[in-house]
């Protein structure tokens, strides 16, 4: 036919059998990728330390999505929360991956069958004998079926009525687990961080989809609307489908980047805003203050801070610190976290407690400044070797550790104090193993960052695709010179021009 690469899809423009075939093949590719990617991730995933080396630090992308839907165990005998599992059952990580690959194979065979047997009776209008698809009716069928699936997911899977429930975390990502969810029907259900809204919204949206599907199956569109919106043209379907996809992609990019009940930090890592707002730091200080109010020592209170909570309060886990095009997992960047050294408390020679000003998200370097409780600068580490009235040496800064591996240890040596002040810029201080993975020390983003970037980028591209195909279908006769009422199967590389009966036509 001599079609350019960007026009090859016109071969299925008015060939319903092969249009169906290529869509089944697309489903096969998507399911096959998901299953294969899951098996690859399971082959490289190390489940031994769910606190300091969780899935998101290891760059896992599909495992978190399986986990949030209720899959927590592996046929390898491990569970996502640590420990061993004796009876993981059919729906383990490997079971889900295998089901996707098997489904992919069946779709592959179905696609081949429909490509070979494309000329089916069902695709012909019995009144005219010409190939025809009743697109409004097909829309109704799809809307009804997707409504059933949506309702079923919300009413059965999420609620635990027939299914495991979904992953639910506390606000600080410490005690998350899979559990059934009760639908939330009040205004609080619209809070993106309330899991009950997931159940209620799927039930409501599914009900609406079922009713809308039945409506479109039983009511025909008016002729003017049918012609005005080009409801008989398959490119109208393409345009509106792209609109649905780009809208969904924009929404999930937002829920992933800003955080929501659907994207728990235990599975996808913390958001950048939790670092920007000192979210975990505030909770840590709240717990410490509560302990001190009960007459516990600093050492006791800091020792009770969960290592998991302290690890969230480290800038290396901020998804905005990794460059978009730095390949690899977070572990390939700053290394594998081995242990929390403890919380450093700095004091000057007058006994004032000093706080290291933390590095903002979008800085690669930042001056090391120590301020007192009133925010007054008391010490710093100058960029140049220079005399400074605020220097660590002149101010006599010391550091003492509470909690963690260095609990009770203090240092007054200026070089050591500066080293820990520099590290305290980055939040809580952790020992990091860079040797195992040959980590380069340059921060990487988490799957939260990749997912957001990918979906926002494709949403933008698909937005332009929607405009393009929408314009083409609305103004097809103007743009292409193709008769909008053309229903013969023609070879679209040799165009049938509007008003030109001499243009070569070839029946399919």
Swiss-Prot record:
One of its GO terms (cellular component) is thylakoid membrane. Keywords: Chlorophyll, Chromophore, Membrane, Photosynthesis, Photosystem II, Plastid, Transmembrane, Transmembrane helix. Gene3D superfamilies: Photosystem II CP47 reaction center protein (3.10.680.10). InterPro entries: PS_antenna-like, PS_II_antenna-like_sf, PSII_PsbB. GO terms for biological process: photosynthetic electron transport in photosystem II. One of its GO terms (molecular function) is electron transporter, transferring electrons within the cyclic electron transport pathway of photosynthesis activity. Pfam families: PSII. It is a multi-pass membrane protein. The chain crosses the membrane at residues 21-36, 101-115, 140-156, 203-218, 237-252, 457-472. It is found in: Plastid membrane. Binds multiple chlorophylls. PSII binds additional chlorophylls, carotenoids and specific lipids. Its main location: plastid. HAMAP family: PSII_PsbB_CP47 (MF_01495). One of the components of the core complex of photosystem II (PSII). It binds chlorophyll and helps catalyze the primary light-induced photochemical processes of PSII. PSII is a light-driven water:plastoquinone oxidoreductase, using light energy to abstract electrons from H(2)O, generating O(2) and a proton gradient subsequently used for ATP formation. Belongs to the PsbB/PsbC family. PsbB subfamily. PSII is composed of 1 copy each of membrane proteins PsbA, PsbB, PsbC, PsbD, PsbE, PsbF, PsbH, PsbI, PsbJ, PsbK, PsbL, PsbM, PsbT, PsbX, PsbY, PsbZ, Psb30/Ycf12, at least 3 peripheral proteins of the oxygen-evolving complex and a large number of cofactors. It forms dimeric complexes. This is Photosystem II CP47 reaction center protein. The gene is psbB.
């Amino acid at each position: 036919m001599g079609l350019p690469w960007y026009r090859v899809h016109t071969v299925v423009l008015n060939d319903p059998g092969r249009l169906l075939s290529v869509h089944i093949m697309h489903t096969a590719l998507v399911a096959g990728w998901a299953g294969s990617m899951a098996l690859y991730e399971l082959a490289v995933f190390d489940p031994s330390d769910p606190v300091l080396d969780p899935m998101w630090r290891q760059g896992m992308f599909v495992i978190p999505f399986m986990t949030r839907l209720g899959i927590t165990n592996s046929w390898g005998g491990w569970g996502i929360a640590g420990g061993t599992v004796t009876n993981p059952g059919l729906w383990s990580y490997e079971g889900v991956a295998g089901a996707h690959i098997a489904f992919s194979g069946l779709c592959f065979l179905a696609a081949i069958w429909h490509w070979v047997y494309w000329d089916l009776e069902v695709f012909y209008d019995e009144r005219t004998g010409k190939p025809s698809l009743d697109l409004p009716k097909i829309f109704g069928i799809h809307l009804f079926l997707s409504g059933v699936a949506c309702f079923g997911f919300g009413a059965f899977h999420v609620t635990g009525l027939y299914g495991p429930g979904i992953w639910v975390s506390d606000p600080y990502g410490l005690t998350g687990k899979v559990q059934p969810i009760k639908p939330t029907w009040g205004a609080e259900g619209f809070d993106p961080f309330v899991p009950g809204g997931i159940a209620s919204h799927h039930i409501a949206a599914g009900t609406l989809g079922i009713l809308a599907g039945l409506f479109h199956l039983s009511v025909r569109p008016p002729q003017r609307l049918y012609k005005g919106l080009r409801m008989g043209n398959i490119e109208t379907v393409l345009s509106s489908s792209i609109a649905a996809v780009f809208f969904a992609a924009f929404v999930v990019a937002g829920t992933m980047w800003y955080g929501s009940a659907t994207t728990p930090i235990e599975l996808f890592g913390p958001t950048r805003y939790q670092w920007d707002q000192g979210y975990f730091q505030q909770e840590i200080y709240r717990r410490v203050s509560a302990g001190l109010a009960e007459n516990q020592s600093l050492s006791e209170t800091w020792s009770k801070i969960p290592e998991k909570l302290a690890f969230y309060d480290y800038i290396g886990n901020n998804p905005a610190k990794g460059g978009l095009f730095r390949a690899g997992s977070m572990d390939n960047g700053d290394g594998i976290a081995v242990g929390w050294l403890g919380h450093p408390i700095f004091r000057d020679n007058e006994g004032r407690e000093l706080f290291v000003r933390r590095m903002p998200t979008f800085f690669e370097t930042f001056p090391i400044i120590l301020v007192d409780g009133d925010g007054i600068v008391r010490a710093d580490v100058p960029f140049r070797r220079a005399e400074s009235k605020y220097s660590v040496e002149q101010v006599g800064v010391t550091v003492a550790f509470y909690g963690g591996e260095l609990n009770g240890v203090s240092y007054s040596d200026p070089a050591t104090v500066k080293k820990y002040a520099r590290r305290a810029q980055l939040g809580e201080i952790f020992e990091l193993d860079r040797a195992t993975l040959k980590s380069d020390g340059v921060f990487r983003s988490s799957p939260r960052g990749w997912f957001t970037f990918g979906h926002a980028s494709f949403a933008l591209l698909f937005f332009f695709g929607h405009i393009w195909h929408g314009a083409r279908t609305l103004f097809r006769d103007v743009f292409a010179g193709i008769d909008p009422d053309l229903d013969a199967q023609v070879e679209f590389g040799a165009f049938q021009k509007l008003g030109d009966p001499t243009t070569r036509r070839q029946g399919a």
